[in-house]
Amino acid sequence: MKHNTKKLVLSGLFLAIGLVLPFLTGQIPEIGNMISPMHFPVLLCGFICGAPYGALVGLILPPVRFLLFQMPPLYPVGLAMAFEMATYGLVSGLVYSRVQHNIKGIYLSLVPAMVVGRIVWGIAQVILMGLSGGSFTFQAFIAGALINAVPAIVLQLILIPLIIAALHKAKILK
């Protein structure tokens, strides 16, 4: 299979996983917010397929999921998530393409992606809430990006490196 075709097929797979993975939380928004199941396939897509594919999957996943399952709500949550997850896929892919493919390199790619993605989410929330006449405070940002997201952050910091390292060890990734 040609390299670009493989990346396209894998991106479709990550999109599909992102569509169904939230069902593991029972569609309960509070649990979904804590675990962030849609973030995992986007981060993996950035690592495995590269920045453009990861960014595109991240950008289209929330709106497509809304169209199919009416979750997450498109405005402002889904749109802010789309920018956040596009950033996850973009940054993880860009940084990972420039570092050694070992555990240190995985973390050097994952942590900036998580930080920048959450900052982009906050900026998107400020803009989207401002457009609708609402407000998004710094306290809401801290709660949404950090405090409520601690379980997701911990899971991402554990599982993403394990998955990428296992794929390298199995020689599935080069």
Please identify what each model-predicted range represents:
Residues 27-32, 70-79, 99-174:
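Membrane-embedded alpha-helical hairpins and interfacial helices in multi-pass inner-membrane proteins
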Residues 10, 14-18, 42, 46, ...:
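Alpha-helical transmembrane segments in multi-pass membrane proteins
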Residues 54, 58, 127-130:
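A cytosolic-side transmembrane-helix exit/cap motif
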Residues 1-48, 52-56:
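Hydrophobic transmembrane alpha-helices
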Residues 20-37, 60-95, 129, 139:
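Interfacial aromatic-anchored transmembrane helix boundaries in multi-pass membrane proteins
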